[in-house]
């Protein structure tokens, strides 16, 4: 008979098995990353047990002496890294951060403009998620299919026509910078706020690459802190000082009661790492993405936007409809320890998200494991051998990845996937 304690050991073993599998895999999921041992240490701390409702110095709970200092430090580091007037580090996810900005700057029934999901927009920008929860009328940005980006000229005309309350940039399929500056004049004319969902590219922005939304005219830069930004899971809002009070109130008490204090500490540590190493890390991530795209293209894959050097972000996007079903291809790759995801492309039916034509790849995690351009040809070759040649490369991938088991771009040299066992 299985005892209750046996279940705890089963779960612990599954966690260990997961860590071992990730260490042996080429993880190319564009929305994931690994944290340093110092960030992991924060996540294991007593802060995970505590409550601190409200802002630092204005808590509704006692016992926050050190918690206040940690959050204040994290706020100051975030403002410094992104050169922002105000930062709120309490959102528990990127979607919660988006919702807070929606509540702070617009009302039910207001029109907004955002990317349609197959064009690259995040689900939280759509009627089925956060934007719909807020009750917005959602208009979509005109899209340039060839260049995989918003059509800037058509966008400006549509802003004047629709008069949106929020012009929302950013997305989850995100190869090139969005036309923030180009929207500014029209936004001012109709009284719209510009919001930039930088969840996927936050680490690139922090490193000084991709684009600089706050300098280009965005009122709010919002994102999750665990994709290209190598922190713990959570959200952040960076904004103009004039919006600070409304956004803070939308976060608490509006959407978050107690925020995750151990994640705030981890975010502060990750932000310090990015101040030190962010430029080098971001540049290498983008260089790796371009090189991987080039290698995949040379091997016969239909990698999008060859005429634009494929990408300016961490992402590489392929249309695999000419060689198979993306859903089946991604499963075959997973069986060979190559982890990525199927993805809707602009020409796909939004109702067929389970059977799209695209594959999305991200290079941020393998970059943090120490890979550079020279390794991208090997990664591409493994993908080709599975997808086009039908080979089993699982053992070869595990052997290949055994040389890349440590976290780079951090203050200490540590194992990336070590199971942190507490006795």
UniProtKB/Swiss-Prot annotation:
What start-end ranges are recorded for coiled-coil regions in this protein? none
Task: Name the EC number(s).
Answer: 2.1.2.-
Instruction: State the organism's lineage.
Output: Archaea, Methanobacteriati, Methanobacteriota, Methanomada group, Methanobacteria
Q: Where does (6S)-5,6,7,8-tetrahydrofolate bind?
A: 121-123, 242
Name-wise, this protein is Serine hydroxymethyltransferase
* Noted pH dependence of activity: Optimum pH is 8.1.
Site (Plays an important role in substrate specificity) found at 226
Give an example GO molecular function. Answer: pyridoxal phosphate binding
């Amino acid at each position: 008979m299985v005892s209750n304690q046996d279940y705890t050991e089963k779960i612990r073993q599954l966690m260990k098995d997961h860590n071992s599998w990730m260490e042996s895999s080429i993880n190319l999921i564009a929305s994931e990353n690994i944290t340093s041992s110092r960030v992991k240490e924060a996540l294991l701390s007593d802060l995970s047990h505590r409550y601190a409702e409200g802002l630092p110095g204005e808590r509704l709970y006692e016992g926050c002496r050190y918690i206040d200092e940690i959050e204040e430090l994290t706020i100051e580091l975030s403002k410094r890294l992104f050169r922002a007037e105000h930062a709120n580090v309490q959102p528990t996810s990127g979607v919660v951060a988006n919702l807070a900005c929606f509540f702070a700057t617009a009302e039910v029934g207001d029109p907004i403009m955002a990317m349609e999901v197959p064009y690259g927009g995040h689900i939280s920008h759509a009627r089925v998620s956060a934007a719909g929860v807020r009750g917005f009328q959602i208009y979509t940005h005109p899209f340039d299919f060839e260049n995989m980006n918003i059509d800037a000229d058509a966008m400006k005309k549509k802003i004047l026509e629709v008069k949106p309350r929020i012009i929302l940039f950013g997305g989850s399929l995100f190869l090139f910078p969005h036309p923030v500056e180009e929207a500014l004049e029209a936004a001012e004319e109709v009284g719209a706020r510009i919001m930039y969902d930088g969840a996927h590219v936050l680490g690139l922005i922090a490193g000084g690459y991709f684009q600089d939304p706050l300098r280009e005219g965005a009122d709010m830069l919002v994102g999750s802190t665990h994709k290209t930004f190598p922190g713990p899971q959570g959200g952040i809002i960076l904004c103009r000082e004039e919006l600070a009070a409304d956004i803070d109130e939308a976060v608490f008490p509006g959407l978050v009661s107690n925020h995750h204090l151990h994640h705030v500490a981890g975010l502060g540590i990750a932000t310090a790492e990015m101040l030190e190493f962010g430029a080098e890390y971001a540049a290498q991530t983008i260089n790796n993405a371009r090189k991987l795209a080039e290698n995949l293209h040379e091997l016969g894959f239909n990698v999008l936007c060859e005429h634009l050097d494929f990408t300016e972000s961490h992402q590489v996007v392929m249309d695999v409809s000419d060689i198979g079903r993306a859903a089946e291809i991604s499963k075959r790759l997973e069986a060979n320890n190559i982890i990525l995801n199927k993805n809707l492309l602009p020409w796909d039916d939004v109702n067929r998200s389970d059977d799209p034509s695209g594959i999305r790849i991200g290079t941020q995690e393998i970059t943090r494991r120490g890979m550079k351009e020279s390794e991208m040809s090997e990664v591409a070759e493994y993908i080709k051998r599975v997808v086009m040649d039908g080979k089993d490369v699982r053992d070869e991938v595990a052997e290949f990845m055994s040389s890349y088991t440590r976290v780079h771009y951090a203050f200490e040299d540590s194992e990336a996937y070590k199971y942190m066992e507490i006795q």
